[in-house]
Amino acid sequence: MKTQRHGPSLGRWSLVLLLLGLVMPLAIVAQVLSYQEAVLRALDGINQRSSDANLYRLLDLDPRPTMDGDPDTPKPVSFTVKETVCPRTTQKSPQDCDFKEDGLVKRCVGTVILNQARDSFDISCDKDNRRFARLGNFFRKAKEKIGRGLKKIGQKIKDFWGNLVPRTES
């Protein structure tokens, strides 16, 4: 009879331990941020540390690179932010702020950790000069096309003058 008395108690403890075993991994998974959430948290940190007058808001998030499954390993990120009309001292979220017309655009690169408990990032943002790079590419290509065109014109002038000189028949 003693065995039967402890039997149901042991069964209940087994059930409790089984349920705890199922719940614990869910709690761990809940602490992992998505790629975009990690970037937005990093952006909050950037806004807090910024000496600029206004908040920055995410303008463009580059596609997520292929990553390993370890949330504690730093993940590479790259994104573009733009200055908003909201002052840094506001209590508003940057996502609730409109972009400032002709606001400063910055290109940010670095790493984030997806583990919410660690909440770590290493991001640097610089003024976005990609527009100027595209403009430079435009002028370089235009120069090449003009150069080829002038070379063709020069060849035609040379051919024209060559045809004007009377040829002597031998």
From Swiss-Prot:
The gene is CAMP. Disulfide bonds join 86-97, 108-125. It comes from Trachypithecus cristatus (Silvered leaf-monkey). It comes from the Eukaryota. Belongs to the cathelicidin family. GO terms for cellular component: extracellular space; vesicle. GO terms for molecular function: lipopolysaccharide binding. The keyword Signal applies. The keyword Transcription does not apply. This is Cathelicidin antimicrobial peptide. InterPro entries: Cathelicidin-like, Cathelicidin_CS, Cathlecidin_C, Cystatin_sf. GO terms for biological process: antimicrobial humoral immune response mediated by antimicrobial peptide; defense response to Gram-negative bacterium; defense response to Gram-positive bacterium; innate immune response; neutrophil activation. Residues 1-30 form the signal peptide. SUPFAM superfamilies: Cystatin/monellin (SSF54403). It is found in: Secreted; Vesicle. Residues 150-162 are annotated as: Active core. The cathelin-like domain (CLD), which is the propeptide part, does not seem to exhibit auto-inhibitory function, as it does not inhibit the antibacterial activity of antibacterial peptide LL-37. Proteolytically cleaved by proteinase PRTN3 into antibacterial peptide LL-37. Proteolytically cleaved by cathepsin CTSG and neutrophil elastase ELANE. Residues 31-131 form a propeptide. Antimicrobial protein that is an integral component of the innate immune system. Binds to bacterial lipopolysaccharides (LPS). Acts via neutrophil N-formyl peptide receptors to enhance the release of CXCL2. Postsecretory processing generates multiple cathelicidin antimicrobial peptides with various lengths which act as a topical antimicrobial defense in sweat on skin. The unprocessed precursor form, cathelicidin antimicrobial peptide, inhibits the growth of Gram-negative E.coli and E.aerogenes with efficiencies comparable to that of the mature peptide LL-37 (in vitro). Keywords: Antibiotic, Antimicrobial, Cleavage on pair of basic residues, Disulfide bond, Immunity, Innate immunity, Secreted, Signal.
